[in-house]
Curated annotation (Swiss-Prot):
Keywords, comma-separated and alphabetical: Carbohydrate metabolism, Hydrolase, Manganese
This protein's encoding gene: fbp2
Xref: Gene3D superfamilies: 3.60.21.10
SS bonds (residue pairs): none
Family matches, as InterPro entries: FBPtase_class3, Metallo-depent_PP-like
Necessary cofactors: Mn(2+)
Name used for this protein in its record: Fructose-1,6-bisphosphatase class 3 2
Keyword Hydrolase: yes
Source taxonomy: Bacteria, Bacillati, Bacillota, Clostridia, Eubacteriales
Top-rank taxon: Bacteria
Pathway where this protein functions: Carbohydrate biosynthesis; gluconeogenesis
Enzyme class, spelled out: hydrolase
Protein EC: 3.1.3.11
Length: 653
């Protein structure tokens, strides 16, 4: 570059900055940005469809908004006033409805709270450039908000101007809309970047609300979880993934998500189940956590039959992938042919177990993995429904566009489950298309194959292999998302002996306190071991039994703390979140969240406690990944200035 061997590139840059003055101004702007405080990052994991606590934690920035209100109004507002202001920022529309019913002098209330919101907004926007704040402003009020943010209300020369704006907003009956706009702007400015470290989907009631919220969020990235990849595979047309998704939904009485939210017709499955399992009580398939106020006995009976029907279909479909892909090394998971159908037993590892359920009306004992003609028709109908669900396709496309298997960002390595290892602490390898992959290369290969599975032409070999890989990522021993040797689905349904249910974790989990392992992973992913951290979820932290989410002297942080209600008996909490601001890292542990309605009607907040993971000298933008990009831009602009001044490129005035 110094020898101007890349004049072509500089000529292109000159179109954007056609004069010395323009290039100089941009250099000054970029240098100034480098000295601003680093924006706040917010980390969440393992949401499992639990939309209410997710929405609340997103709105409160894991306590960041409450802290900002305390900083601004510590000595000027009473605790009850701070609490009321906090609720207004979180839930402006709902809070306004209550205020309008109860407040006698609404114009006075408007005036007081508009001043408070402007002061708070001024505080949270102070770490950003005017340009960045301007881009975040709601279009309807952008000019007015910008004026108010940059005018001090105690400036005597402008006091009348400032007050005039507020009074006019109230007078023309735009105060409600303005309060909503300011509140949402504050929420947006408090968090600069959101990281979702997997498992948006699972057994929770409304993963769709979570995804719709994320689609509209200003800055987000996603690291796929094992449940996410399962739904992604289903949306891509993998019938085994479809069967798994339906089985889990039936198991947890969550078929409403499939039928009502994603518009997938389950009547063919219900009809099939009633026909073929009519005289089967399906006792081992009664759904868990059924709310008797929502489901009658006949509905539970139907779901149980659907549950069993799709489970048997799943086992048959898995055979097709396992035989098609010998490199998956999963023949040992084919169990339907190991059953002794005459006495209802199965022999595993030389031990014979009696089956809990001995009724198999759709299995041909001479060819147990063969789909019946009715099963084939059903699977085809379900596949068409999943592929043609517009809402599901929109959500899965978003997961591909904003997601990946892992992310390196500001010296943090983010992934959902694990980096597959061997017992000797070396990277576990897998052969794909005759080539061996391990470590970062394995995850990169998985990522690209999953994308081929979704985006390739239907019927192509690339499409088929890609969707098979998505199923493997759900259940395979080398999957960074699954993180175990085997998924014992059959054993959990059909064998009472719980020793057969155990799923052996990848050795990665035994080494999470090993600095040697963490450093090896950092080097593999091109990160500096002295400055980097691993942040992941997937395995609930058993806080109530004394497990610490901060491992390996702070080099590894696990933030699966129990957003999913099913895991709270293990964790003793209702979730961990993490924030990383200019002062360092804070781990926040959350108690169970009652409801959004309770939050705005009673001004309750989720009870949380904060633990400082790492305190830093104040980090600036220049210390971040964005800072590195800006420094490269500055370097190029300085070269452009040289080219202008040496006459190698002409200014265009």
């Amino acid at each position: 570059m110094e020898k101007y061997d890349d004049i072509k590139y500089l000529s292109l840059l000159a179109k954007q900055y056609p004069t010395i003055a323009a290039a100089s101004t941009e250099i000054i702007n970029l240098e100034a940005i480098l000295n601003l405080p680093k924006g706040t990052e917010h980390f969440l994991a393992d949401l499992h469809g639990e939309y209410e606590p997710f929405v609340h934690v997103l709105k409160n920035g894991s306590g960041a908004i409450k802290r900002k209100i305390q900083e601004v109004f510590e000595n000027s507002l009473m605790d009850c006033e701070k609490r009321s202001l906090t609720t207004l920022v979180y839930y402006p529309e709902q809070k306004l409805e209550i205020v309008l019913r109860e407040e006698k002098d609404i114009n006075d209330w408007y005036k007081i709270n508009l001043y408070r919101l402007i002061e708070l907004c001024r505080h949270v926007s102070s770490k950003y450039t005017r340009s960045k704040v301007r881009k975040a402003l709601p279009p309807d009020f952008s000019y007015i908000i910008e004026e108010l943010l940059h005018e001090e209300s105690d400036n005597n020369d402008k006091q009348g101007y400032y007050d005039g704006i507020i009074n006019t907003i109230i007078e023309i009956e735009r105060a409600q809309e303005f309060i909503v706009a300011l509140s949402k702007l504050i929420q947006r400015l408090v968090i600069d970047r959101l990281h979702i470290i997997g498992d948006i989907f699972d057994r929770g009631p409304r993963p769709d609300i979570i995804l719709d919220t994320l689609i509209n969020y200003h800055s987000v990235d996603i690291q796929w979880g094992n449940h996410d990849i399962l739904w992604m595979g289903a949306a891509s047309g993998n019938t085994t993934c479809i069967a798994n998704v339906l089985r889990i939904a039936a198991r947890y009485s969550n078929l409403d998500v499939i039928e009502d939210i994603y518009g997938i017709n389950l009547l063919p499955l219900a009809t099939f189940a009633l026909k073929h399992y009519k005289n089967d009580n399906c006792i081992a398939f009664v759904p868990k956590n059924t709310d008797e106020t929502l489901y009658g006995a006949s509905e539970i009976e139907l779901i149980s039959k659907m549950h069993k029907a799709i489970t048997i279909i799943q086992f048959k479909l898995e055979y097709e992938i396992i035989k098609r892909r010998p490199e998956f090394n999963m023949d040992h998971r084919l169990l339907l042919d190991k059953i002794n159908y005459s006495d209802g037993t199965i022999t595993l590892n030389n031990i014979t177990y009696e089956l809990c359920d001995k009724s198999f009306p759709t299995i041909n004992i001479n060819n147990p993995f063969e789909l019946t003609s009715d099963e084939k028709k059903l699977v085809s109908k379900l596949q068409i429904s999943f592929i043609n669900s517009d809402k599901l396709q929109k959500h899965v496309l978003f997961l591909f566009n904003k997601g990946r298997l892992y992310l390196t960002y500001n010296s943090n390595l983010l992934f959902h489950g694990c980096i597959p290892l061997n017992k000797d602490k070396t990277f576990k390898s897998m052969t794909i298309h005759g080539e061996e992959y391990k470590g970062k290369k394995l995850l990169d290969k998985f990522d690209s194959l999953a994308r081929e599975g979704y985006f390739s032409t239907r019927g192509s070999a690339e499409k088929l292999y890609g969707i098979d890989i998505m199923w493997y990522l759900w259940t395979g021993a080398c999957s960074s998302l699954f993180g175990k040797e085997d998924m014992t689905t059959f054993e959990r349904y059909f064998i009472k002996d719980k020793s057969t249910h155990k799923e052996k974790k990848n050795p990665y989990y035994n080494f999470r306190d090993s600095e040697e392992m963490c450093n090896m992973i950092f080097e593999e992913f091109g990160l500096d071991p002295a400055e980097s951290r691993i942040i992941n979820g997937h395995v609930p932290v058993k806080n109530k039994f004394g497990e610490n989410p901060i491992k390996c002297n702070g080099k590894l942080i696990v933030i699966d703390g129990g957003f999913a209600k099913a895991y709270r008996s293990q964790t003793g909490l209702a979730g961990y979140t993490l924030t990383y601001n200019s002062y360092g890292l804070q781990l926040i542990s959350h108690q169970p969240f009652k409801s959004i309605e309770d939050a705005f009607s009673k001004e309750t907040d989720i009870l949380s406690s904060t633990q400082i993971v790492e305190k830093l000298d104040r980090k600036k933008v220049g210390d971040t990944d964005i800072g590195k990009e800006l420094k490269n831009q500055i370097k190029d602009l300085k070269l452009l200035l040289k080219a202008y001044r040496k006459g190698l490129i002409n200014e265009v005035r």
